[in-house]
UniProtKB/Swiss-Prot annotation:
PROSITE patterns in UniProt: CYTOCHROME_P450 (PS00086)
Source organism per UniProt: Aspergillus fumigatus (strain CBS 144.89 / FGSC A1163 / CEA10) (Neosartorya fumigata)
Gene this chain is encoded by: afumB
Function per UniProt: Cytochrome P450 monooxygenase; part of the gene cluster that mediates the biosynthesis fumihopaside A, a hopane-type glucoside that enhances the thermotolerance and UV resistance of N.fumigata. The first step of fumihopaside A biosynthesis is performed by the squalene hopane cyclase afumA that catalyzes the cyclization of 3S-oxidosqualene into the hopene 21-beta-H-hopane-3-beta,22-diol.
Annotated compartments: Membrane
Protein name: Cytochrome P450 monooxygenase afumB
Length: 508
């Protein structure tokens, strides 16, 4: 009996060993073919002696706490080149700002890289079925809820909604004194986007904001703050309590789900009663993103997560764009004067139309340049889901390919690619909107809204929203004067901003 059992165990182990050997051989063959086909060579390595990657973690954490993470990124690329390898907790990680590699990861070899493992743990608690928390078929399904809607910006861009937001903003701007525009921009965009997304705004600029909406807005802000913190702490975030974070996520989800169910009930009632008219509140909801998504699905959780995704991603990106733009305009009087003259000459002092905004060429240059100098998302990451490669960065001269093993992470830095003198000239660190006259950004690693299949679907809507607010402010105020002598200091959240805000005086 024991002999038969021993023979069976031996046979099983033998077969297992053979399978392992065959798989190992096949993997070596695949890797060999990749190396030969793309001339792969090892890139330069940051601290090759730091085998466990502990020094890297210490250094990165120190720079993050000292608010010098971005200057450190620039220094590392200057030292090791546009692509280099490092180790973080024994894992080999690749950093790149080479436009060729960025396009490769986001576009050419999109299917070789996943995003969810990088950020799913951040977004899943608040949008478990949203596009930032999933990959593959589930990602395609979640993204499809937005695709057709955002492809028709003229149809969904509500000019009156934008004007209402501006009127709420203007009431908060004092005459004859300095003020920080950054928190006002955040409130403006949150109010407009929540009204667009749900048909009912969170009213953060209003004096009579309800307690419920105040709690939801605060919960949303807190959740985003913790998501940003945990994103930069990486695995270390598990050492910190997330109890309050989870509670904030539930507050946001519960409120949005209540709005979703209310709209679904109203739809069903109108369908059954054949009601010809609706009240003002319902009319607003029928024009909202929520209502348009409900035209495609009745999955409550999918709709809820789609709406919450807009509240998270859409709010921070537009608020960051506005704050960065006005920070720079306050320090470049010539640009502000030129932009104001274009607006007055082509639009006048009346609220702009959709076509007015689309034709504001110099304004688009200003936004492009602001997002180039201070990228909204200074770095991002993808994880290889198979053995693959990068087209550049290997070898002594950095012109060979780089082998990327399955499970290894590639971190690409728009902070580096947007500020590259090779792409944007010797004055790449200067704010000069005129550089965009005739400049094609496709091959320059310019990715303020990402690129490829994961490109931001709402980028045109975001630009329209930021444009409307900017035009109305510049129409109203003759001058924008800087009132802050402090240098720009990084504040890395879900989007990049200046820690010191936008302290200015707006002069009629």
């Amino acid at each position: 009996m024991y002999t038969a059992l021993g023979l069976a165990v031996f046979t099983a182990l033998f077969h297992y060993t053979i399978v392992l050997a065959i798989n190992h051989y096949r993997t070596r063959e695949i890797l060999s073919q990749l190396v030969k086909a793309h001339n792969c060579c090892p890139p330069k390595t940051e601290r090759p002696w730091d085998i466990l990657g502990l020094v890297k973690i210490y250094s990165s954490t120190k720079h993050l706490l000292n608010e010098t993470a971005l200057s450190n990124v620039s220094a590392l690329f200057k030292c090791y080149g546009d692509t280099y390898a490092s180790r973080i907790l024994t894992q080999r990680v690749y950093f790149t700002c080479d436009p060729r590699n960025i396009r490769h990861v986001l576009i050419n070899r999109f299917s070789d890289f996943d995003a969810s493992d990088v950020r799913a743990h951040l977004f899943a608690p608040i949008t478990p079925h949203g596009i930032f928390a999933v990959d593959g078929a589930e990602w395609k399904e979640a993204r499809s809820l937005y695709a057709d809607i955002f492809s028709a910006t003229r149809k969904i861009f509500d000019l009156q909604l934008q004007e209402d937001g501006f009127q709420g903003l203007i009431k908060q701007i004092p005459r004859g004194q300095a003020m920080d525009l950054a928190p006002l921009f955040l409130k403006l965009v949150l109010d407009v986007n929540s009204a667009f997304a749900m048909g009912t705004g969170l009213d953060t600029l209003k004096q009579d904001q309800s307690l419920e909406k105040k709690e939801v807005a605060e919960a949303l802000m807190y959740a985003k703050k913790i998501m940003a913190r945990d994103g930069f702490l990486g695995p270390l975030h598990y050492l910190l309590s997330r109890k309050d974070f989870y509670a904030a996520c539930e507050t946001v989800k519960a409120y949005v789900e209540k709005v979703v169910r209310k709209e679904m009930t109203a739809r069903e009632y109108q369908k059954q009663s054949n009601a010809a008219t609706v009240d003002d509140e319902r009319q607003k909801r029928t024009q909202s993103l929520l209502s348009r998504i409900l035209d495609n699905t009745n999955d409550v959780h999918a709709v809820r997560d789609a709406v919450v995704t807009i509240l998270i991603a859409g709010t921070d990106s537009v608020a960051s764009m506005l704050s960065t733009t006005f920070y720079l305009l306050a320090r470049h009087e010539r640009v502000y004067a030129k932009l104001r003259q274009e607006i007055l000459d082509t639009i006048g002092t009346e609220p702009p139309t959709y076509d007015n905004i689309r034709k504001a060429t110099y304004l688009r240059y200003v936004f492009n340049e602001a997002m180039r100098v201070y990228p909204p998302v200074p770095f991002n990451a993808r994880t290889a889901n198979r053995d693959t490669y990068l087209p550049a960065g290997g070898g002594p001269d950095g012109q060979s390919g780089v082998l990327i093993r399955k499970g290894q992470r590639v971190i690409f830095a728009s902070w580096g690619s947007h500020r590259s003198t090779r792409s944007f000239g010797a004055d790449a660190l200067e704010f000069r909107p005129e550089r965009w006259e005739g400049l094609k950004s496709e091959s320059l690693g310019y990715i303020p809204f990402s690129a490829g299949p994961r490109v931001c679907l709402g980028q045109q809507y975001a630009l329209l929203e930021a444009s409307y607010a900017t035009i109305r402010i510049i129409q109203t105020f003759e001058r924008l004067e800087n009132r802050d002598v402090r240098p720009w200091t990084e504040k890395i959240g879900l989007n990049l901003s200046n820690k010191n805000g936008v302290l200015v005086e707006l002069v009629h």
